[in-house]
Amino acid sequence: MPERDPILLTPGPLTTSRMTRDAMLRDWGSWDAAFNRLTKSVCADLVRIAGGGDAYVCVPLQGSGTFAVEATLGTLVPRDARVLVPNNGAYCARIAAILRRLGIAHVELPFAEDEPASAHAIDAALARDARLTHVALVHLETSAGLLNPLDDIAAVCRARGRALIVDAMSSFGALPIALAASGIDALISASGKCLEGVPGMGFAIVRRSALEAAEGRSPSVALDLHDQYAYMQRTSQWRFTPPTHVLAALRAALDQFFDEGGQPARGARYARNCATLVDGMRALGFEPFLDARAQASVIVTFYAPADPAYAFPAFYAAVRDAGYVLYPGKLTTADTFRVGCIGALGADEMRGAVAAIGGALESLGIAMR
């Protein structure tokens, strides 16, 4: 008999619905008018979810979310700019690495891996250094599941007259974001996260005026957001071969997103998943790494068992054999592992995951207390 698909307790790729997977069974011509209409409808809905209005445009891009992050930074940030990067995890550090490779001056503002970025500290940093032109913020630092206070930081940037670029890779669709009201200049996310599509397409939702001012700025051909946008405006087509099946799956996923009730309903389901998971894991003896006030309902980091019998590869394999896929830890300060709460999942799947983890502890002889 064929193996049953495992349930992915990861922050993307994630478990998708049958309707989303079925959408990939059709082939599309990349220059066909029907596919162009598909692209246009997806982009319009993404701007709507972000609360962007007419002042913002969506630029899709082939590749993972990091491709879109690098494309956005490389296109929107001038080479003589100076960027403040609040850093409390691996994905914040990745932004700094991209800026370094692009040759763009930047300043990292460090926070602990369990500490949300402080709007007050960001305000003070901007006040100290008038050369800072941009802030590049990770909304939800997936390495721990840490939520940074986007609205407060956006208010600081707006008051200080600094541009704000937001990596919303793991928050877009699950948490409320209002681009126009917040004054955010660009938001970046991807198809295979909280929208519950499949991986393969990133996108940036950008203030139209900022994008139109960025012509010729990108050092890359493939990652030039302005050129991608301008070409789509002229032709309705992608510059290079588009991920046709990924886009079709995202269209189906967006239809389900709206049918569910949009961001409020999606966020509420993830919150129920998270609460079910944390309660069940605590009953087994596990503790979350983050304080509940900083915890996002997308992915939870748990301290690893202290028992010497614990080793993540064997633990992972035992849980995988029961039909669930965990995520390794990504912290520098503690031995941890992560469990995602997103995807086409509900509380029943979270209870099943807890049971599988409990079974793994028993089969491997790992004591929790």
Swiss-Prot record:
Q: Which InterPro entries match?
A: Aminotrans_V_dom, NH2EtPonate_pyrv_transaminase, PyrdxlP-dep_Trfase, PyrdxlP-dep_Trfase_major, PyrdxlP-dep_Trfase_small, SP_NH2Trfase/AEP_transaminase
Q: Which reaction does it catalyse?
A: (2-aminoethyl)phosphonate + pyruvate = phosphonoacetaldehyde + L-alanine
> Where N6-(pyridoxal phosphate)lysine occurs along the chain?
193
Which keywords annotate this record? Answer: Aminotransferase, Pyridoxal phosphate, Pyruvate, Transferase
Q: Which domain of life is it from?
A: Bacteria
Q: Which cofactor does it need?
A: pyridoxal 5'-phosphate
Q: Which residues form a coiled coil?
A: none
Signal peptide coordinates: none
Q: Name one Pfam family in it.
A: Aminotran_5
According to its UniProt entry, the protein's GO biological process terms are: organic phosphonate catabolic process
Protein's UniProt keywords contain Transferase: yes
**Enzyme Commission code(s) on record:** 2.6.1.37
Q: Which family does it belong to?
A: Belongs to the class-V pyridoxal-phosphate-dependent aminotransferase family. PhnW subfamily.
Outline what the protein does: Involved in phosphonate degradation.
HAMAP family, A to Z = PhnW_aminotrans_5
The record describes its quaternary structure and partners as: Homodimer.
**The protein's name in its UniProt record:** 2-aminoethylphosphonate--pyruvate transaminase
